[in-house]
Amino acid sequence: MASHRTDRTKNPTSNGDVSKVDLLLHPELLSQEFIQLMLQERNIAVSDPEDRDRLTGLYLQHVIPLPQRELPRSRWGKRMEKSRPRLSSSSTHSSSTDSGRKRPLIVFDGSSTSTGCVKLKKPDSSSAPVTTDRLKPPVSSVSLTNPIRKLSGASTNCSSSNFSNRTPVSSSGAIPKSPSNHSNSSVHSNNATSKLKRTSPSKGEPDTAKDIKSPETKKKIQHITWP
């Protein structure tokens, strides 16, 4: 039992015995015939089988797996382990679609670093179509001799009142007949405006008179008597 325990505790590589995995990861320790056999299994053509360095480079390029980070034994690590085969299948699918493309992908190799000046084509104003959807008419179509002006309601009322207050004037160059007509018209207009002003508060006047004559107001007014 003791000897069996000591055999278990011994390191397998302590006696110089190298495992098969370590041999596969170190092609310099493998024989030339074994490397050729591995390349033939991967269907990789070898131009010069006698060149040791060439065989080693092909082995490192096609046979040795890519290094991968070990995932932790947690929930996230288990989830990533399940998603790894999906990623590999998607990568193979994308590679097959890339190979089936008509035009190859453009890859910048860094050789052509000097780029020419970029020329921008200016749009031709003459060939551009004339748009008919305009919110306002162009300036050229507006007649400057007879412009149309829109006035608000307040301005029209003011203009009408001013026009009523003004005296009637004859054509240019004519002289009014007499100053008495001018004074009579101004007095008439003033009387008309005063009547308009008086008619508006006429409705509220009887109410105010009633309020003054009501007995409640008389009761509130008390005369102060001195002893």
Curated annotation (Swiss-Prot):
Residues 153-173 have a biased composition (Polar residues). One of its GO terms (biological process) is embryonic morphogenesis. Residues 71-227 are annotated as: Disordered. It comes from the Eukaryota. Keywords: Nucleus. InterPro entries: Ashwin. One of its GO terms (cellular component) is tRNA-splicing ligase complex. Residues 71-84, 204-219 have a biased composition (Basic and acidic residues). It holds the Pfam family Ashwin. Residues 88-98, 178-191 have a biased composition (Low complexity). Its main location: nucleus. It is found in: Nucleus. Belongs to the ashwin family. This is Ashwin. It comes from Danio rerio. The lineage of its organism: Eukaryota, Metazoa, Chordata, Craniata, Vertebrata.
